[in-house]
Curated annotation (Swiss-Prot):
Family assignment from sequence similarity: Belongs to the calmodulin family.
Protein residues bound to Ca(2+) 1: 21, 23, 25, 27, 32
PANTHER family: CALMODULIN LIKE 3, MYOSIN LIGHT CHAIN 1, 3
Domain of life: Eukaryota
More about this protein: This protein has four functional calcium-binding sites.
Protein name: Calmodulin
Record's keyword annotation contains Calcium: yes
Keywords of this entry: Acetylation, Calcium, Metal-binding, Repeat
């Protein structure tokens, strides 16, 4: 399944993996998974975190390594994000609930994920998704960005 991914996708997933793998040891633990989920405003229980890991933990060692992470991401991409998942993700970014993701909101979420971005990088991300050119990302633009891969 993971063999259907492009090199660019694999590189993106490697970057995502390293956001989760806080100590850089090549595996994601329940603790690391919990940290990232909480930084995104989720509040999973220990049992939920364990379930999430068990779902993809092919070798049964209780952690997720990069190949397992790739398999999980490939699976997720196949049942392309449901409308509800995309709406949920949009809400994570749209902090003030006004229906738009501003540069400040994008920066806030990325900083919570441990990604320090320059103003230029944040503006560039907004520009890429901002179809109508109003300087922010509305829900339709967000959906377009999330589903056009």
């Amino acid at each position: 399944m993971a063999d259907q991914l492009t090199e660019e996708q694999i590189a993106e997933f490697k970057e995502a993996f390293s956001l989760f793998d806080k100590d850089g040891d090549g595996t994601i633990t329940t603790k690391e998974l919990g940290t990232v989920m909480r930084s995104l405003g989720q509040n999973p229980t220990e049992a939920e975190l364990q379930d999430m890991i068990n779902e993809v933990d092919a070798d049964g060692d209780g952690t997720i390594d990069f190949p397992e992470f790739l398999t999980m991401m490939a699976r997720k991409m196949k049942d392309t994000d449901s409308e509800e998942e995309i709406r949920e993700a949009f809400r994570v970014f749209d902090k003030d609930g006004d229906g738009f993701i501003s540069a400040a909101e994008l920066r806030h979420v990325m900083t919570n994920l441990g990604e320090k971005l320059t103003d230029e990088e944040v503006d560039e991300m907004i520009r890429e998704a901002d179809i109508d050119g109003d300087g922010q990302v509305n829900y339709e633009e967000f959906v377009t960005m999330m589903t056009s891969k």
